Curated annotation (Swiss-Prot):
GO terms for molecular function: indole-3-glycerol-phosphate synthase activity; magnesium ion binding; phosphoribosylanthranilate isomerase activity. InterPro entries: Aldolase_TIM, Indole-3-glycerol_P_synth, Indole-3-glycerol_P_synth_dom, Indole-3-GlycerolPSynthase_CS, RibuloseP-bd_barrel. Its EC number is 4.1.1.48. This is Indole-3-glycerol phosphate synthase. Belongs to the TrpC family. It catalyses: 1-(2-carboxyphenylamino)-1-deoxy-D-ribulose 5-phosphate + H(+) = (1S,2R)-1-C-(indol-3-yl)glycerol 3-phosphate + CO2 + H2O. The gene is trpC. Keywords: Amino-acid biosynthesis, Aromatic amino acid biosynthesis, Decarboxylase, Lyase, Tryptophan biosynthesis. It comes from Mycobacterium tuberculosis (strain ATCC 25618 / H37Rv). Pfam families: IGPS. Gene3D superfamilies: Aldolase class I (3.20.20.70). GO terms for cellular component: peptidoglycan-based cell wall; plasma membrane.
Length: 272
């Protein structure tokens, strides 16, 4: 029987890929590598800097858009993002639909001094230790992909390794689950991973229900400064931008434009 949703299909492939990697590098080996890695950077401090932060993403493809960009040198792209003023660099490592890899994560980590987010579909504890072993400071956890008890344990394990979890939601119900699990950083994805449909009003509906102590990140749909300002007005602390940057002719300048808008005195400030 074929998977029921787009997310189910992605997760099926991820589980197979994780099993293959674990057959090559055991859980005990990846745990040892994680323990030996340099300590993670302070993601919360980066996200609490004044203004609307920009999380700039290294992303080659997506299930909705297909191939986006040929990124021959992810390290160079990450450096451009950092030079443009990005707070965090996100690296998509899922290989089947997004054409990412852990090699991309390694290259980016070695090239920038700001925090790095591993963006993938985390379904096994192995992937958490793997992220830390490859230098991630932050890790994506998708509520729709995890049962509640698993979400809680994954969040606890992520934080026990010193990383910050970006807990992704798409509905008010998922946001409630994220809060009950103890999420400190919640990302609202305008794209429904079940269908790939986009609801651009999603963030504005969900953000007001989140406590002021929670960092709120808007994901998907940022094509320029107008979108950043709209998300800021709805209460975003930061925006995560991928497609709009990798398809731009000058990613450093594209990030710099967003950063300038997000730190301008006229930019709406999140209520705290």
């Amino acid at each position: 029987m074929s998977p029921a949703t787009v997310l189910d299909s992605i997760l099926e492939g991820v589980r197979a890929d994780v099993a293959a990697r674990e057959a090559s590098v055991s859980l005990s080996e990846i745990k040892a590598a994680a323990a030996a890695a340099p300590p993670p950077l302070d993601v919360m401090a980066a996200l609490r800097e004044p203004g609307i932060g920009v999380i700039a993403e290294v992303k080659r493809a997506s299930p909705s858009a297909g191939a986006l960009a040929t990124i021959a040198d992810p390290a160079k792209l990450a450096q451009a993002y950092q030079d443009g003023g990005a707070r965090i660099v996100s690296v998509v490592t899922e290989q089947r639909r997004f054409q990412g890899s852990l090699d991309d994560l390694d290259a980016v980590r070695a090239s920038v001094s700001i925090p790095v987010l591993r963006k993938d579909f985390v379904v096994q504890p192995y992937q958490i230790h793997e992220a830390r072993a490859h230098g991630a400071d932050m890790l994506l956890l998708i509520v729709a992909a995890l049962e509640q008890s698993v979400l809680v344990s994954m969040l606890d394990r992520t934080e026990s390794l010193g990383m910050t979890a970006l807990v992704e939601v798409h509905t008010e119900q998922e946001a409630d689950r994220a809060l009950k699990a103890g999420a400190k950083v919640i990302g609202v994805n305008a794209r429904d991973l079940m269908t790939l449909d986009v609801d651009r009003d999603c963030f504005a509906r969900i953000a007001p229900g989140l406590p002021s102590s929670v960092i709120r990140i808007a994901e998907s749909g940022v094509r320029g400064t107008a979108d950043l300002l709209a998300y800021a007005g709805a209460g975003a602390d930061a925006v995560l931008v991928g497609e709009g940057l990798v398809t731009s002719g000058d990613p450093r300048a594209a990030v710099a434009d967003l950063v300038t808008a997000g730190t301008h005195p006229s930019c709406p400030k999140p209520a705290r």
